C-alpha cells in the first residue's frame, strides 16, 4: 500500500505544473501559433533540463513538459477570456 501511495506522490509536481500552465495560458490573450514547433522545442529543452531525482521513467523534465502543454491547452481553451 505504501508503494502505491509513494508512486502516485511522484506525479504531483507534474500535475501542479500542468494546472499552473493552464492558468498561465488562459491569461495570455494572443493565440499561440505553430504548436508543433513549440512542442519540439519543449522536448529539446526538457531533455537538457533532465528529470527530478527518483524520476527514472524518461530522461526528460516531465514537469516542464507538462507546464508547456498546460500553457498551450489553456490558451486554446480560454485564450484571454479569464480576467
From Swiss-Prot:
Subcellular compartments: Cell membrane
Topology relative to the membrane: Multi-pass membrane protein
Protein name: Uncharacterized protein MJ1306
Keywords: Cell membrane, Membrane, Transmembrane, Transmembrane helix
GO CC aspect terms: plasma membrane
Annotated TM spans: 4-24, 32-52, 54-74
Amino acid at each position: 500500500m505504501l508503494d502505491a501511495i509513494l508512486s502516485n506522490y511522484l506525479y504531483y509536481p507534474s500535475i501542479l505544473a500542468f494546472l499552473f500552465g493552464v492558468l498561465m495560458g488562459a491569461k495570455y490573450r494572443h493565440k499561440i501559433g505553430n504548436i508543433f514547433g513549440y512542442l519540439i522545442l519543449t522536448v529539446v529543452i526538457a531533455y537538457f533540463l533532465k528529470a527530478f531525482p527518483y524520476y527514472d521513467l524518461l530522461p526528460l523534465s516531465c514537469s516542464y513538459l507538462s507546464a508547456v502543454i498546460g500553457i498551450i491547452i489553456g490558451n486554446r481553451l480560454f485564450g484571454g477570456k479569464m480576467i
